[in-house]
Amino acid sequence: FINVKLSAAALSRRAAEIAGDPRSGAARVSQPRRVVIDFGGWNVAKEMHIGHLRSTVIGDSLQRLFRFMGDAVTSDVHLGDWGLQMGQLINEVRLEQPDLPYFDASFTGPYPQNSPVTMDDLGRLYPQASAKSKTDEARRNEDRQATQELQAGRPGYRALWRHFCNVTRIGLERECASLGVTFDLWKGESDAQPFIPELVEDLKARAIAEPDAGAWIVRVAREGDKKEMPPIILVNRDGAIGYHGSDLATILDRRRSIDPQLSLYVVDQRQALHFEQVFRASERAGLMAEASLEHLGFGTVNGPDGKPYKTRDGGVLKLHELISQADRTALGRMQEAELGADVPEAERAEIAHTVAVAAIKFSDLSNVRTTNYVFDLDRFISFEGKTGPYLLYAAVRIKSLARRALSEGVSAGPVSVELDAERTLVLQLDAFNDALRGAYEKRMPHILCDHAYLLAQAFSSFYAAAPILVESDPVRKASRLTLAAATLRQLEIVLDLIGVAIPERM
C-alpha cells in the first residue's frame, strides 16, 4: 500500500472550489442521453398501498439523479388501465347501478360528466368483482365479453372506463403530492393499443412472430442460455394481446414519440423474467436494443415476520394511512425532543409531515435496491442514527447557525484547514462526486444515502471540535462558516436527489 496524505493547502483549495460551486463539486455526464424512466405502474381502481412505495420513491430518486447528471429524462407512470379488470369493474357497476346510461346500447349520449363512482367505491368494487370472476365461470365469461367490447370501442363502456381512469388518477396524484413525487407522463397500457395492429402485422410479415397452437409467439431463447427462456405470447388463442405485446407496443410508442437512448423500468424483482423476455423480443423486432433497456428490480417491504408487510388484521396498509401514521409519530417525536415548540401549530404540523416523508423515503432508499427490508416506523422516525430525521436535524442546525451568523454580522471567508475534524469534513465533501457517479452508474440511491449520513456525521464531529460563532479568531471563524455553508449546500443537493425537503426550522 502507498499512504498519501493531502497537505492542508491542497485541502483548503479543494474546499474553496466546492464551496464556490453551485453543484458542490459534482460533474455532469459528458454525453447526456434521452432517458425514459418507467415507475409507479399502479392499476386503475386500486389505491396506493405500502407495496407500491418502493417503485415510487426509487423511481423518483432516479429521475432526479439522472436529470441532475444532465440527462433529458421523461418519467412515465404507465398505469394498468387496460385488461380484464376493466371488464370486471364494468360488470360490477352494472349490477349495482343497472339503470346508468353506460349500459344502454341504444343511448346516443352525451354521457354524464360526473363519475357514478368514487375512489372508495372502486376500492370496494374491484376486490368484489375479482373474487366473483375467480370462482364463477359464467361471470368470468361475462367479464371477458365486457373487456372485449370496451377494447372494441363500445361508447358507453369507454365513457365509464374514462371515469374509472380519471377518478383513480385524481387519487393517485393526491398521494404522489404528499410524497413530493411527480411524473412527466400519465400514460397507461391503453395508450399503446393503437400501435398493436401494426406491430403484430409487422412481426408476422418478417416471420419474427410465428403461429403456435392457435396463438402467435415470438421465440426469445438463445444458444447458451443457462435457464429456460419461454417464448412470449404476442397474441393468444382468443386473439387478445397480453402484457408482453402491450409492453412491446409501449416501446414502439416511446421510440416514435421520445426516441430514448435508455429506458429504465423500476419494477418488482419478481418480474425479472417478463422483462428479459420483452427486452429480447424488442431486440429481435428491431425496436430497441436489449442493452438500452434495463429492468431495475427491487426487493419487498416486509413486516417483522419477514413476509410482505400486512396490517394487524392481515390487510394491506394503504399509503395514505401509512403517511397519516408517520405524521402522528413524527409530531410525537418532535414533542419528545422539544423540537418545534416555538412555532405555530400549523407550521409544526407541516414540519412533522416533512420529517415523516423523510423517514419513509430514507428508510427505503438507504437499503440496497435489490434487497428486502423490514418496515419499522418507530425506528425510522428517530432523530438519532442513520435516519431521514437525523439528516434533517443536521441540515436545520446548520441553517440556524447561518441565521445567527448573519444576525451577528459574521461573514464566510477563505478556507484554511487546520484541525483533523476539518480535514475529515473536507474529504467527505470531496467524496460527493464519486458517490454521485456510483449511484448513477449502478442505479443505486442507497449510495447517496450513505454519503449524506457520513457527511452529517463528519459535520457533527467538526462542529464539536471547531466552534464557529464563539471562535475568537475572525479568520478561523470565517473559514469554518464557509465549511458549514458548503456542507449545507451539499446536504440540500443530496437530500433533494432522494426527494427529501428540508424545513427552515425545527
Functional labels for PLM-detected ranges:
Residues 1-12, 19-506:
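Non-catalytic interaction-recognition regions
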